[in-house]
Swiss-Prot record:
Function: NDH-1 shuttles electrons from NADH, via FMN and iron-sulfur (Fe-S) centers, to quinones in the respiratory chain. The immediate electron acceptor for the enzyme in this species is believed to be ubiquinone. Couples the redox reaction to proton translocation (for every two electrons transferred, four hydrogen ions are translocated across the cytoplasmic membrane), and thus conserves the redox energy in a proton gradient.
GO biological process: aerobic respiration
Cofactor(s) annotated in UniProt: [4Fe-4S] cluster
NCBIfam families registered for this protein in UniProt: NuoI, PRK05888.1-4, PRK05888.1-5
Binding residues annotated for [4Fe-4S] cluster 2, in chain numbering: C72, C101, C104, C107
Comment on bound cofactor: Binds 2 [4Fe-4S] clusters per subunit.
Record's catalysed reaction(s): a quinone + NADH + 5 H(+)(in) = a quinol + NAD(+) + 4 H(+)(out)
Protein name, UniProt field: NADH-quinone oxidoreductase subunit I
Organism of origin: Novosphingobium aromaticivorans (strain ATCC 700278 / DSM 12444 / CCUG 56034 / CIP 105152 / NBRC 16084 / F199)
Protein residues bound to [4Fe-4S] cluster 1: C62, C65, C68, C111
Alphabetical list of InterPro entries matching this protein: 4Fe4S_Fe-S-bd, 4Fe4S_Fe_S_CS, NADH_quinone_OxRdtase_chainI
């Protein structure tokens, strides 16, 4: 043991350094928040709960191209479609198994009409696994509920896409 180490051990140098660090941060603003009542701002690129969007006239955006189903690495998306009278296709079944989803965002990137998006909601805890099997009605209701925030996030992210 060197003389310097011996002096530091007798003077409790580590103890002084620890208390100095505590005092330094004691007078700074807090870094934590009171979570349920205060929330940090989310990035426009945040990937949360899935939603199906509609056009302003109320028609579903999804054209049943099934690109999102094909690109999903977790195989969490299931789509069934049928043609309409005007020759276009629309989905009859659009299911997402949220227990399989890895929130990679590939479905959102692959969609040519921005129909499937990952919205800003991250608080969707459930009591059963069955509640995490989202059908078309649940996805459309998510889209209706979060449309304003989703549109703002897509607009903010548009220069980078």
């Amino acid at each position: 043991m060197t003389v310097g180490q011996l002096i530091k051990s007798f003077t409790l140098w580590e103890f002084v350094k620890a208390h100095w660090l505590t005092l330094k941060y004691f007078f700074k603003p807090k870094a934590t928040i009171n979570y349920p009542f205060e929330k940090n701002p989310l990035s426009p690129r945040f990937r949360g709960e899935h939603a199906l969007r509609r056009y302003p006239n109320g028609e579903e955006r999804c054209i049943a191209c099934k690109l999102c189903e094909a690109v999903c690495p977790a195989q969490a998306i299931t789509i069934e479609a049928e043609p309409r009278e005007d020759g276009s296709r629309r989905t009859t079944r659009y299911d997402i198994d949220m227990t399989k989803c890895i929130f990679c965002g590939f479905c959102q990137e692959a969609c040519p009409v921005d129909a499937i998006v990952e919205g800003p909601n991250f608080e969707y805890a459930t009591e059963t696994r069955e509640e995490l099997l989202y059908d078309k009605a649940k996805l459309l209701s998510n889209g209706d509920k979060w449309e304003r925030a989703i549109a703002a996030n897509l607009e903010a992210d548009a220069p980078y896409r």
